[in-house]
């Protein structure tokens, strides 16, 4: 991405500007706007606590990514399924337990559609800006709330 700005080229991306890649891109990433379902810079108590615990586990310079957030939420749902089945191996009961399930994730409110099992979640418009420690980060600038997976939403019409 170095030099693209000098050539008047705007890089439109999604996960390509994740925090783990931004140190290599550097300040030339400033102003890139992306849409994604997570940013470690979400200003919510749940996310701040998640980031704090993540850094405690993986080091003070570690920054949660979309992948680590996905793993966190997946384990949350698996734990709910285990609770619902009292630890028994019962796939039908486990799936029934999460039909229509909703929770407050560090990425915001998430719910599972009881029919399609697709999730509804917020999508954040993020802009790469300077953040603490001289780093660049994807800072949320707008939120689309409760976004339904587009394919299934179109099929319901």
PLM feature segments, named:
Residues 1-157:
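Extracytosolic ligand-binding ectodomains
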């Amino acid at each position: 991405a170095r030099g693209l700005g000098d050539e008047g080229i705007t890089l439109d991306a999604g996960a390509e500007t994740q925090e783990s890649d931004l140190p290599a891109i550097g300040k030339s990433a400033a102003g890139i706007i992306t849409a994604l379902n997570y940013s470690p810079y979400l200003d919510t108590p749940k996310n701040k606590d998640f980031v704090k615990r993540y850094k405690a586990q993986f080091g003070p310079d570690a920054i949660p990514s979309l992948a680590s957030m996905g793993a966190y939420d997946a384990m949350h749902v698996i734990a709910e399924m285990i609770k619902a089945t009292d630890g028994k191996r019962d796939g039908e009961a486990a799936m029934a337990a999460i039909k229509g399930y909703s929770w407050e994730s560090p990425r915001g409110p998430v719910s599972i559609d009881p029919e399609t099992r697709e999730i509804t979640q917020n999508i954040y418009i993020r802009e790469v800006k300077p953040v603490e420690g001289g780093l660049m980060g994807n800072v949320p600038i707008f939120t689309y709330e409760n976004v339904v997976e587009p394919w299934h939403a179109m099929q319901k019409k």
